């Protein structure tokens, strides 16, 4: 099964079809037998919510694997999840994925990657440049830059131009 981008899931009609989602965990909440995992893949600003009901798991759920994986999950972990896309019963999002299986592809050490659930200041991101790509602000900037570069390249390609990366030729003529 091919993973589906979160931006495509959020704009689709929920019909209970099985989907595969890959991305980074933004938050994990466990409350009274219900587990909520917010996942983002960078394709859009919004997250998709993965849900798991410990008291009433779906018939296809790999319960033991889900429980083991949930112990490893924290903010920043990368996951691959399979589940049914359904209309969300709660307000806040139109659709959600009920977990049938989940795999932790990589954990995130909070000491090496001090990702915060709340918004990180620009000063904090300046000091921790490796975290920029995981923020909504920089993700939006990267998506805009991608669209702009694509438009410029398309414009020139349609007019017969070719793109080339010229090598940098530099010389060092230092004084003193």
Predicted regions located by residue number:
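Class II aminoacyl-tRNA synthetase catalytic cores and aaRS-like
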Residues: 1-176
